[in-house]
């Protein structure tokens, strides 16, 4: 695909430059920096290819899967528990789940493992922008039209306003350098999965505090 080729060109150019310089560099510290650049660029290319391949597989698989009535509450609880088991001890980041208890159930028409993937990718994104010992809030509620809403709210730096329309584009990534763990496909995959379920996804910055909010609205059953 042309967009994959375009995205690989940047790390390839950097890789080529670093490899050309390193053989003529005698300074140990400079060589270490160049090796670090080489490693980072190779990993970036590997992530791009792996994620793109997975996305293509997902697109084929999605066309074959059947949707069922499922309660979002139990799926979300399971994913939140899994993430807390990893990140509370690893980085002190806690995922808090807030459910509107006045609502008995949160039924949607969906594919269970794809719903898990939506939340997992959103949490991955929030965690990558969060500093250690912060809280990420996952909220489930319904709007006045009885549509189920899943929100992920973090305490990171938020999105740059002018880039809010771009964050769901394929390969877009505004991630800080120290969090270079993803290819920029995560939110694009989420958008595709949400739209497969007939839903809407929105992103915004928190008005009264730092951080960002991503909201997924599922259609009424």
Predicted regions and their residues:
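Short alpha-helical segment of the dimerization/phosphotransfer core of two-component systems
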Residues: 40-45
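Conserved micro-motifs of the catalytic ATP-binding
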Residues: 60-65, 105-110
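Short conserved segment of the HATPase_c
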Residues: 159-171
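Short alpha-helical Gxxx[C/S/T] motif in the catalytic ATP-binding
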Residues: 186, 190
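Conserved glycine-rich
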Residues: 198-199
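Short helix-loop "hinge" at the ATP-lid/N-box region of the Bergerat-fold HATPase_c
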Residues: 126-127
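A conserved beta-strand-to-alpha-helix junction within the catalytic ATP-binding
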Residues: 66-81
